[in-house]
Design a protein with these regions (language model features):
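A composition-driven surface/loop motif
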Residues: 70-409
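Sec-dependent N-terminal signal peptides
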Residues: 4-13
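Basic side chains
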Residues: 2-3, 319
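Compositionally biased alpha-helical segments
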Residues: 20-71
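Sec/Tat signal peptide C-region and signal peptidase I cleavage site
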Residues: 15-19
């Protein structure tokens, strides 16, 4: 009874206060309400408290605090990671839409189907045994602000809702994600949906089970200030379904045992730009040494309109760029296109897993299955190794402009 009276007194005070914040503590989750928009405070037989559509069991409430701090930003869930002491703060206007669980430094949230506006999930802090999981039915924003997260058992960050995910790297921030070895996860940072990456921050990725980063739909790097560093991966650096597009920023990939950037087709052949890579600007640097590895690999077309691409690739059967469809290298107005490749290796011989027959993959600077059009830009290439070649084209070659330098010729 004393507890209930305390709750009633606190809520009454909050309702009367202007420019104050009411915080409801349940475990390591804080629900933040601005007093001026709180509205009615309802008790249900003293066993439940309802605030802005969110119902709390009074037995689950640890405390209610009213202070003059600023309320959480609207439509926001904040996660402050701290080894063994991670806290979640959620704004009251979306609390009723989110099912949140905190277990140690592992945080999961599932948004209900009633969610009809975008929610921002803001992550920061450090945890050496933590993770973030999100599922839902509506597009969302994921913001990293000096986040350092390692999950020894699975993905560090897994977004599972299948919608557009706006990934923002806070300006000036450095963020690092690492997963554990021997898990079942597809990537250290996985998005089931399509990702648009922005912000003048840095994201470091280490994939100890499979890929460093993966998405089941397109990934688009949109901002010139964005820097993504793949430090290592058991398989691909970036593994993207549908298409990968880069308009600016910096992408550095090294230490992978698979391809640096791999764009694969989805199951629906009607999906926009399926299996394509589109580079309109920015800088990509790739340094990888492995058997039959590729720097850039597009299952279908690859289009380069601008930007700088530098690839140092070595290993039998390796390729600086592998194009399953057509390749266009152009230089858009106001842009500069520069491709520098150093590729070394001999022929990789193997048994085809489908036919069971012997097969081989030759070392190439650029391998094009379809047609190749060069209309602008500069390509510099050094290729070494027995039977290695600079550019191999199965289809037609059309020259409209630009420069190609291959050593040896």
């Amino acid at each position: 009874m004393k507890r209930i009276f305390t709750l009633i007194a606190a809520t009454a005070l909050t309702s009367a206060a202007v420019a104050q914040t009411m915080k409801v503590y349940t475990g390591h989750v804080v629900t933040s309400y601005a007093a001026e928009v709180l509205g009615d405070v309802n008790f249900n037989n003293g066993t439940q408290l309802t605030l802005q559509g969110k119902t709390f069991n009074t037995s689950d409430i640890d405390s209610i605090v009213v202070d003059r701090s600023q309320a959480a930003a609207a439509r926001t869930m904040q996660v402050a990671y701290a080894n063994g002491n991670t806290w979640v703060t959620v704004s009251g206007d979306v609390a009723s839409l989110l099912n949140i669980a905190v277990k140690g430094d592992h945080v999961s949230v599932v948004a209900t189907p009633e969610t009809a506006e975008e929610i921002t999930y803001a992550l920061g802090g450090t945890a050496t045994n933590g993770s973030f999981y999100m599922d839902g039915h509506y597009k969302s924003t994921l913001r990293f602000d000096n986040l350092n997260l390692t999950n020894p058992d699975s993905a560090a960050v897994c977004i599972d809702n299948g919608k557009r995910i706006n990934v923002i790297l806070a300006d000036g921030s450095t963020n690092s994600l690492t997963d554990g070895a021997g898990g079942m996860q597809k990537a250290c940072f996985f998005i089931n949906g399509h990702a648009e990456i922005k912000g003048a921050g840095v994201l470091n990725l280490t994939g100890n089970t499979k890929h460093a980063y993966a998405s089941d739909e397109y990934t688009w790097i949109k901002n010139g200030g964005t820097t993504i560093n793949v430090l290592s991966a058991v398989s691909d650096g970036l593994h993207v379904d549908q298409y990968f597009q880069m308009d600016g920023g910096t992408l550095n990939v090294s230490g992978t045992k698979g391809d640096c950037v791999d764009a694969s087709c989805t199951k629906d052949p009607a999906d926009l730009q399926n299996g394509q890579i589109i580079i309109n600007g920015g800088a990509i640097t790739m340094d990888v040494a492995a058997i039959d590895v590729k720097g850039l690999k597009g299952e279908k077309d690859v289009t380069i309109n601008g930007g700088t691409i530098k690839a140092t690739v070595s290993g039998d059967g390796s390729k600086g760029m592998s194009v399953g469809g057509n390749l266009l290298v152009a230089q858009a107005e106001g842009a500069t296109t520069l491709i520098n490749m150093t590729v070394s290796g001999t022929t990789y011989k193997y048994t085809d897993p489908i036919t069971g027959l012997p097969d081989s993959s030759k070392c190439r600077g650029i391998k094009v299955t379809g047609n190749y059009t060069l209309s602008g830009g500069t390509i510099n290439m050094t290729v070494t190794g027995k039977k290695a070649k600079g550019i191999s084209i199965d289809g037609e070659y059309k020259y409209l402009g630009g420069t190609t330098n291959v050593v040896p010729e």
